[in-house]
Structure formats: structure tokens, C-alpha cells
Amino acid sequence: MEIKYLLTVFLVLLIVSDHCQAFPFSLIPHAIGGLISAIKGRRKRDLDGQIDRSRNFRKRDAELEELLSKLPIY
């Protein structure tokens, strides 16, 4: 093999091994944060916020439909 192919293969292997080594260590903080939020019950509060946003969206949609129905037809 020529040296440029060997260098290319070496660099690809170096990049892949670096990503594989960093992968488990990036999962640890996310797992800890998920456990803490599950213990504190943040998910429940987030769902309540999503429900409120959904209600507000439906209310705005109904108001928009009412406004459009009142506009004259051109």
C-alpha cells in the first residue's frame, strides 16, 4: 500500500476510536440528569406545561377561525 492510503486509514481509525471512547462518558451525565429529574418529578411539570400550551394553541386557533369568519369575502 502507498503511504497516503495508510495515513488515511490510520486517521480514520484514530477518529473512530476517539468517538467510541468518548461515547460512554457522554452518556453518564445525561443518565445522572435523567435520574435526578425523575426523582424530582420534573417530567410531570413539563407535561403540565405542554398541556397548557396545547390549550392555548387551541384557543388561539378558535379565535383565528372566528376572526376569519367575520372578515368580508372579497
Curated annotation (Swiss-Prot):
Subcellular location: Secreted; Target cell membrane
Keywords recorded for this protein, A-Z: Amidation, Antibiotic, Antimicrobial, Cleavage on pair of basic residues, Cytolysis, Hemolysis, Membrane, Secreted, Signal, Target cell membrane, Target membrane, Transmembrane
Propeptide: 46-74
Cellular component, GO annotation: extracellular region; membrane; other organism cell membrane
Gene Ontology terms: biological process: defense response to bacterium; killing of cells of another organism
Tissues expressing this chain: Expressed by the venom gland.
Signal peptide start-end: 1-22
Positions where Lysine amide occurs in the chain: K40
Family designation: Belongs to the non-disulfide-bridged peptide (NDBP) superfamily. Short antimicrobial peptide (group 4) family.
Function statement: Has antibacterial activity against the Gram-positive bacteria S.aureus (MIC=48 uM), the Gram-negative bacteria E.coli (MIC=120 uM), and the yeast C.albicans (MIC=64 uM). Causes hemolysis on horse erythrocytes.
Name of the protein this chain belongs to: Antimicrobial peptide 2
Lineage: Eukaryota, Metazoa, Ecdysozoa, Arthropoda, Chelicerata
